[in-house]
Swiss-Prot record:
Signal peptide: none
Subcellular location: Golgi apparatus membrane
Function, in words: Involved in transport from the ER to the Golgi apparatus as well as in intra-Golgi transport. It belongs to a super-family of proteins called t-SNAREs or soluble NSF (N-ethylmaleimide-sensitive factor) attachment protein receptor. May play a protective role against hydrogen peroxide induced cytotoxicity under glutathione depleted conditions in neuronal cells by regulating the intracellular ROS levels via inhibition of p38 MAPK (MAPK11, MAPK12, MAPK13 and MAPK14). Participates in docking and fusion stage of ER to cis-Golgi transport.
Source organism: Pongo abelii
Residues with the Phosphoserine modification: S139
UniProt keywords, alphabetically: Acetylation, Coiled coil, ER-Golgi transport, Golgi apparatus, Membrane, Phosphoprotein, Protein transport, Transmembrane, Transmembrane helix, Transport
Gene: GOSR1
Region (Disordered): 37-60
UniProt feature, compositional bias: Basic and acidic residues: 41-50
Membrane topology, from the record: Single-pass type IV membrane protein
Any one GO CC term of the record: SNARE complex
Transmembrane feature ranges: 228-248
Protein name, as recorded: Golgi SNAP receptor complex member 1
Length: 248
């Protein structure tokens, strides 16, 4: 019976790790899509403002965004379900020492799920903000072009407005590049943190699996501390005796 429940727990952990790996890859691609969206709009100068469908050039990216968002939401829901099953298992497990180790593993998976959920919503919000801004700026440029073609006069005010508009677009491009660098740095830090958590978890697992080794290490540390105290006391006494002898 214990072997069956142990296999059930290992199956849940395997499912959680597989879903976490899939989510990590999806979120990296999702972040790259968000970054490339603004860059492609900047290279085009506008999203085909002369067309009656201003989203035509970005329609493929919009469809890809919607598809990836749905896939990530489904993966997050599946991972949440696996975590809930792991929580039910830990509550029904009966051995206190084993239950503590399982709770530690469950909390680590919950932290990973929380990080992925936060990163997904943040990236999605950034994408929506970029798309709205690009649509707004494309509409402004379309109005300007319509005004120029209707009047047929390139007056000074219109030229200044266009220059200011281009300047704002260049500023937005620099800001987006800075954000992309920051997001890449965050991804690297998240990956390193995951590696450190994995190492810490393995060390705890080894310590729980081999309590005799853990007890031996503790006794060695206590003996080292005791020897250090004794050595310090001997050195202190010798120093006092030398000082008394020197000043006698």
């Amino acid at each position: 019976m214990a072997a069956g429940t142990s296999n059930y727990w290992e199956d849940l952990r395997k499912q959680a790790r597989q879903l976490e790996n899939e989510l990590d890859l999806k979120l990296v691609s999702f972040s790259k899509l968000c970054t490339s969206y603004s860059h492609s709009s900047t290279r085009d100068g506008r999203r085909d403002s002369s067309d009656t469908t201003p989203l035509l050039n970005g329609s493929s990216q919009d469809r890809m965004f919607e598809t990836m968002a749905i896939e990530i939401e489904q993966l997050l829901a599946r991972l949440t379900g696996v975590n809930d099953k792991m929580a039910e298992y830990t509550n029904s497990a009966g051995v206190p020492s084993l239950n503590a180790a399982l709770m530690h593993t469950l909390q680590r998976h919950r932290d990973i799920l929380q990080d992925y959920t936060h990163e997904f919503h943040k990236t999605k919000a950034n994408f929506m903000s970029i798309r709205e801004r690009e649509n707004l700026m494309g509409s402004v440029r379309k109005d300007i072009e319509s005004y120029k073609s209707g009047s047929g006069v390139n007056n000074r005010r219109t030229e200044l407005f266009l220059k200011e508009h281009d300047h704002l677009r260049n500023s937005d491009r620099l800001i987006e590049e800075t954000i992309s660098i920051a997001m890449a740095t965050k991804e690297n830090m998240t990956s390193q943190r995951g590696m450190l958590k994995s190492i810490h978890s393995k060390m705890n697992t080894l310590a729980n699996r081999f309590p005799a080794v853990n007890s031996l290490i503790q006794r060695i540390n206590l003996r080292k501390r005791r020897d250090s105290l004794i050595l310090g006391g001997v050195i202190g006494i010798c120093t006092i005796l030398l000082l008394l002898y020197a000043f006698h």
